[in-house]
């Protein structure tokens, strides 16, 4: 699994540079996240702490569940996803690939859509996350898309699942709980995104571990 976390804030000085995808691939790896979109190269800067905290928390929580249930692979940026040939090169904050689609994972990138993508919004990524990527992920076959917006006075999480018509539909959150389709049996208390309780204990709750096991976990962490 990838261990480094995503960045989202775009720097555009005199407009993004233009180049072919092959030229983009040949760029030196200087530790910066770069996306290639419609022939433009987008350089990214380090995000805010809250962005990384949420990405890291989801990586631990989802990762525990996906590994325990043997459901597939989970990645965080920097990891390239090229949804379709000739399409944009994106580096989602978090992406999940199911066991059935592991053949899409190559040595350097994911060739094809992830089953689930999570983008955590920053001030500079609002248009990309809510508009550009929403349309792009919908058109290329992503099954589920979460948008987590931690900005002050805008704190919210939106969940979309692919409908029978192939379009994203807003998924229900009932009693503060969201249930995923792309990750079978996984559910999430939305408040956890902001509270970020211990990921192992929340995983134990999701997985339905007995009270005895949960108590043992708490004692080990005490």
Task: Report residues per predicted region.
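Gly/Pro/Ser/Thr-rich low-complexity, intrinsically disordered segments predominantly at protein N-termini
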Residues: 1-222
């Amino acid at each position: 699994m990838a261990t480094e976390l995503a960045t989202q804030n775009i720097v555009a000085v005199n407009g993004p540079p233009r180049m072919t995808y092959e030229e983009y691939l040949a760029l030196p790896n200087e530790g910066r996240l770069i996306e290639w979109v419609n022939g433009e190269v987008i350089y990214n800067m380090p995000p805010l702490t809250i962005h990384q905290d949420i990405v890291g928390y989801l990586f631990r929580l989802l990762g525990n569940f996906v590994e325990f249930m043997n459901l597939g692979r989970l990645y965080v940026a920097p990891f390239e996803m090229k949804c379709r040939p000739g399409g944009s090169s994106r580096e989602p904050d978090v992406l999940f690939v199911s066991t059935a689609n592991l053949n899409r994972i190559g040595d350097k990138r994911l060739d094809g859509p992830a089953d689930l993508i999570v983008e955590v919004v920053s001030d500079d990524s609002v248009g990309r996350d809510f508009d550009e990527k929403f349309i792009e992920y919908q058109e290329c076959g992503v099954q589920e898309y979460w948008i987590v917006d931690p900005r002050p006075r805008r704190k919210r999480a939106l969940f979309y699942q692919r409908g029978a018509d192939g379009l994203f539909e807003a998924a229900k959150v009932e009693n503060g709980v969201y249930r995923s389709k792309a990750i079978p049996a996984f559910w999430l208390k939305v408040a956890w995104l902001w509270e970020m309780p211990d990921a192992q204990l929340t995983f134990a709750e999701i997985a339905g571990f007995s009270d005895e096991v949960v108590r043992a976990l708490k004692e080990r962490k005490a």
